[in-house]
Amino acid sequence: MVLINPQIPPNTGNIARTCAATRTELHLVGPLGFEISDRYLKRAGLDYWPYVKLMYHLTIDDFCVYQQKSGGRAIGFTVRGSSSYLEYSYQSGDWLLFGSETDGIPADLLNQCDDTVYIPMAEPGVRSLNLSVSVAIGLFEARRQLGFIR
């Protein structure tokens, strides 16, 4: 799970808790809109922080170097994705990328993604879901396809 420039501490805290529950690594890519020690971030994650496998990358370039060395496909979640997250075939080692609450994934990084997916909206007037909700939806679908959910 990769968050690019997250801005809202409670969203990141909720995502950290979801990652802890699923034993999923959480990669935060700076700059962040808050300090890692932010009380709202900690509060949202409650007492689950010891279970979070957290990695911090100062810049997008730093993350890209790490991701290339580690292998796996970069899957960008964006409202302009090329296919529905439900129709996509996830593989072990995929990196699920989510952008900031206000700007999404930067265009230059989105262009480097191996694939892009979107979460369908029934109401055209609603542009997107909350970041922590979107992450949970994408993560649980990938885990379901990979056989981690029974």
Where are these regions (language model features)?
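Post-transcriptional modification and biogenesis factors for structured RNAs
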Residues: 1-150
